[in-house]
């Protein structure tokens, strides 16, 4: 049992419905890993979205997610997903079983940019 907690992999699928609050897309809460050096992979299954990333220096960038796209999230990088389409958006993830999650950092300080719809397109806007 314990060896899988230390050396295993977790897999998960997330579903995000389309929509916005104001002009900000529906998104996941976002997190760093508790074991900050742990990486993660995301891949698109259905619909379209954006992977929003922020390093420990609070630099923010985004990558377009679509069915079949594969994305590497290095250790030390916070991440969240947003549904930028008009249909259900789903993606899969794989991460080390000892990565843990640190949601508190994002809850307390947020991301340094927001993904908003501007002129009908997703755009990162610094805060």
For each predicted feature, which ranges?
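Histidine-centered metal-chelating micro-motifs
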Residues: 50, 70-71, 75-80, 100-101
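Double-stranded beta-helix
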Residues: 82-127
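Short, small-residue-biased leader/transition segments that mark boundaries at the very start
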Residues: 3-4
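Short acidic-hydrophobic catalytic motif
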Residues: 8
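Short, conserved beta-strand element in jelly-roll/cupin
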Residues: 16, 35-55
């Amino acid at each position: 049992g314990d060896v899988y907690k230390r050396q295993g992999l977790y897999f998960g699928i997330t579903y995000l419905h389309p929509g916005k609050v104001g002009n900000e897309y529906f998104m996941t809460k976002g997190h760093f890993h508790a074991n900050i050096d742990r990486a993660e992979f995301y891949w698109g299954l259905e619909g379209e979205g954006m992977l929003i990333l922020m390093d420990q220096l609070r630099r923010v960038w985004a990558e377009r997610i679509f069915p079949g796209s594969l994305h590497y999230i290095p250790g030390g990088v916070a991440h969240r997903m947003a549904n930028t389409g008009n249909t259900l958006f789903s993606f899969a993830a794989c991460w080390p079983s000892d990565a843990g999650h640190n949601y508190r950092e994002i809850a307390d300080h947020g991301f340094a940019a927001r993904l908003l719809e501007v002129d009908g397109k997703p755009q990162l806007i610094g805060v």
